[in-house]
Regions:
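Intrinsically disordered, glycine-rich low-complexity segments
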Residues: 4-9
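Conserved beta-strand/loop scaffold segments within soluble protein domains that form the structured core
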Residues: 15-256
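A structural signal for small-residue-enriched, beta-sheet-centric alpha/beta enzyme cores
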Residues: 175-345
Length: 345
């Protein structure tokens, strides 16, 4: 009997090792005594995941909170950070960071370390971060990082693939980037390239959202062609994806805020048009995540269940203020207003 149990334990351990070997970070959340709890938690260099079991939030709200941290304060050239998150049925999880994700300059690898897979046509390494996430029935995942901050000459790529179990699954996903080290004039929007792509599917791989951005500096040294020139006084680009029944209040708040802000003229928001300069404050673009799905639901008399909010801001505090206000209704789901858990105003 003991021999059989030992073999089972060994096989189980091998499965865990195989699973964790594919990722720098792994989170699994399932119900334990009716409480959302981390039943699998793993991280390795360059990522560390913190799971505070005692949080000073509303204890009547069931939510598991996680914080990701980069060793050394940021990601260096060629770092690959694959992460897996599985939020199972009826659970709630929030994944945050403890500061901006700093991405340092891309460098040429030594010939001994040149594998051919992580080196591009310019013979420099790209830093890459990936996420594979699953959200179960009636579950909610809130992905609430601080923004990426790419240093001069950095190359950064993000790929997020999120699978929702069905229409009862809910998601709040924030993806954003700042201009970089704005205290240095030559480091503003001075990274080489930034690519981010988020794909959200439901059930039978029906695509809900494909949200992507690509920012690149021109190969020439012509200042007029530089990314900094093209971005004008924009300092932050952000996108927020809200899907599912548990984000309904936040979706309504986003729509109301954008509608109200379109009437403001100073230190606030206006609708962004292709040729207009960015005003002081914030500009918005608001859309449903799936036009075909929305049209079908409207014919049935039901409410839209998805929203994508895109934000341009002239400073990072304005962007934080927008996120705090628009996502504040999620407090009832996760126990604390997003981006306010560290005492933000």
């Amino acid at each position: 009997m003991n021999g059989g149990r030992e073999r089972e334990d060994k096989i189980a351990m091998m499965e865990v090792e195989k699973e964790t070997a594919a990722f720098a970070g792994l989170i699994e959340v399932s119900l334990q005594s009716s409480i959302s709890s981390a039943t699998k938690l793993f991280s390795t260099y360059p990522l560390r995941i913190l799971y505070p079991k005692k949080v000073q939030f509303d204890k009547s709200v069931d939510c598991a909170w996680f914080y990701t941290v980069s060793y050394g304060g940021g990601l260096v050239s060629g770092d690959l950070v694959p992460m897996s998150v599985d939020v199972q049925k009826d659970c709630t999880a929030s994944v945050c960071t403890q500061g901006t994700t700093k991405v340092y300059k891309s460098i040429k690898p030594s010939s001994a370390n040149c594998t051919g897979n992580d080196v591009d046509s310019e013979n420099t390494k790209t830093t890459k971060q990936t996420l594979e996430a699953k959200v179960g029935t009636n579950a909610l995942l809130c992905w609430l990082p601080d923004p990426a901050q790419c240093f001069k000459d950095a190359k950064f790529e993000q790929v997020h693939e999120i699978s929702l179990a069905d229409d009862s699954s809910s998601l709040c996903f924030v993806d954003w980037i700042t201009a970089g080290r704005v205290a240095h004039d030559d480091a503003r929007w001075a990274f080489r390239s930034f690519l981010t792509r988020t794909t959200v599917t439901t059930g039978d791989d029906t695509v809900n959202v494909i949200e992507s951005q690509r920012l690149e500096n021109a190969a020439s040294n012509n200042e007029e062609e530089s990314l900094a020139k093209r971005m004008a006084n924009a300092h932050v680009i952000a996108s927020v994806i809200l899907i599912g029944p548990r984000t309904e209040a936040a979706r309504k708040k986003c729509a109301e805020y954008a509608k109200d802000s379109s009437k403001r003229t100073t230190n606030a928001a206006s609708w962004l048009t292709a040729k207009s300069p960015l005003p002081a404050g914030v500009s918005y673009s608001l859309a449903t995540a799936s036009e075909s799905k929305t049209q079908r639901m409207n014919e049935e008399g039901n409410e839209k269940d998805s929203l994508v909010l895109r934000v341009l801001a002239s400073d990072i505090e304005s962007a934080y203020a927008v996120l705090r206000e628009c996502l504040q209704p999620l407090e009832t789901e996760i126990g604390c207003p997003p981006y306010n858990e560290r005492g933000g105003s």
